[in-house]
């Protein structure tokens, strides 16, 4: 339940201040359902995503950004602060803003992919990206920090 609430909050973050309450609720419901589906898919393909970080924040933020374009209320997008968005809403409506948000999301993913590739290359060259199977089986808390995160007797 807490993950669903976080997913809803992640989804509404891009739209905060640009949608009315019914649209905010809709964004929260759609985002939570989509993130739940992403968590299920992640588990079925055995994708290593601790705490469902990408399934909730990556997917939730993407859905929220896209739904902001579809559901933004023109009256809540001040032309003084967001002239391009206000202009798009005025000339092309929410569909035009949705297309602009798709472009922004694609550009963001591209930027993040390049940055991640650079970081992975550096980390891989300096310390390596994986631990041995034996270390992973023993537990990284013990191997890397010399202590257990949880008392094995309570599990």
Question: Each PLM stretch: what is its role?
Answer:
Residues 1-155:
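Glycine- and aromatic-enriched membrane alpha-helices
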């Amino acid at each position: 339940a807490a993950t669903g609430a976080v997913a809803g909050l992640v989804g509404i973050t891009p739209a905060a201040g640009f949608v009315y309450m019914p649209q905010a609720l809709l964004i929260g419901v759609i985002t939570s359902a989509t993130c739940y589906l992403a968590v299920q898919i992640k588990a079925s393909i055995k994708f290593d995503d601790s705490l469902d970080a990408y399934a909730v924040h990556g997917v939730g933020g993407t859905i929220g950004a896209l739904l902001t374009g579809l559901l933004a209320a023109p009256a809540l997008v001040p032309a003084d602060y967001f002239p391009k968005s206000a202009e798009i809403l005025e000339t092309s409506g929410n569909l035009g803003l949705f297309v602009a948000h798709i472009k922004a999301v694609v550009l963001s993913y591209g930027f993040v992919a390049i940055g991640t590739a650079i970081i992975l290359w550096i980390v891989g060259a300096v310390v390596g990206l994986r631990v041995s199977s034996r270390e992973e089986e023993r537990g990284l808390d013990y191997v890397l920090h010399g202590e257990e995160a949880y008392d094995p007797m309570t599990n």
